[in-house]
Amino acid sequence: MKELYPGDQGIWVQYLQLALQRAGQQVMLDGIFGPKTCAAVEEVLGSSGKCAVKEAQWNRLLPFLRGYITHEVKAGDTFFPIAKMYDTTMERVMHANPGTDAGALQIGSTVVVPLNFPLVSGEVPYTSLLTGWIIEGLQARYPYLQVGTIGRSVMGTPLWSLQLGNGPVEVGYNASFHANESITTPVLLKFAERLLEAYADERMYEELYPERLFEEYSLYLVPLVNPDGVDLVNGLLTEGFYYRRAVRIASGFPDIPFPDGWKANIQGVDLNLQFPAGWDMAKKIKFEQGYNRPAPRDYVGQTPLSA
C-alpha cells in the first residue's frame, strides 16, 4: 500500500477518499489530498494532527473498500447486535454466514459482517487493485460466488474469473480488453453484484428469478482482461521496467496521447485483435496504417493468441 501525505494526488488518494466517504465523511473524490481530506482522515482514524496514511491506517480503512469486516464472537453475541454494532443489517450478516446458527454462535469463532453500502462504485477509476478488493468483498458477502483465475497477466496479476450458477448452458462475459475502456469493468461487476443480491433476497432481477437462472446457466465473468494496461492508463502504474518500456513504445507514436490513448496490453499488443478469426485481414489493415510493431493501440501481435 502506498503511503500518502497532504499534497499527494492521484488514484491512491481517490481510493482513500472513497473509503472515507463510506465511513461517513463528506469528501470529494477528486484525488487531491487537501485540507478536507486531511480532516476526514483525522475524524475517522482519531489521529488529530496526523494526516499521514501508512500501512496501519490503510488496514483500518480497507474494510470500506472491500465492503466487509470480520467480527470475533463474544459471549452473548447474536447476528442482530453484531449487525447493529457495525451499522449494517442482519440480513446482510445472514447472507454472508450461511449455515451458521444465529442464536448459538461459538465464542471465539469469526463472523463475516458486510458493511451497509453497495460494493461496486461507479465514481472512481478502476485498477487491478480495486477490482481485487471488490471481488474479495463479493465473495465474502455471497459465499456461493465461485472465484478463480484463468491465468496471469504479463506483470503477474491474476486474471480473475467469477462463476454464477451451475447450469448446463455456459455463457461468458468479459470486460476491459482495451486499457482505456475500463468503464466496462464496473458495469460487469455491478451486474454480478445486483444479480447476487437478488438471489440472496429471493427476488426478481430484471424480470428474471436468479435461482432459476443459476439452475439453467453457468455465467462466467472475467471483469479485467487487461489489468496491466488498465493500471497504466488509470495511474496505478507510474514507474518501473514495464512503465518505462510503455513510455518508449508510446514515444514512437506521438499522435496518441499517453497514457490516455493506450489501448494495448503492457507489451504493446492490442488484445482485441488477437483472435484467430480475421487475424490475417486485421494484420494487413493495421500494418498498412503503420501499426506494424508494438504500439499503444492496433498492433495485432506476431501471431494470434500470442499475447
Region locations from a protein language model:
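Primarily a LysM-type cell-wall glycan-binding module
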Residues: 1-18, 28-35, 63-87, 109, ...
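Short glycine- and acidic-rich boundary segments immediately preceding or forming the N-terminal edge
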Residues: 3, 81, 92, 112-155
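Conserved hydrophobic/aromatic packing and binding residues within compact polymer-binding modules
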Residues: 17, 41, 93
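Active-site/substrate-binding loop(s) of hydrolase catalytic cores
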Residues: 168, 182-186, 190-307
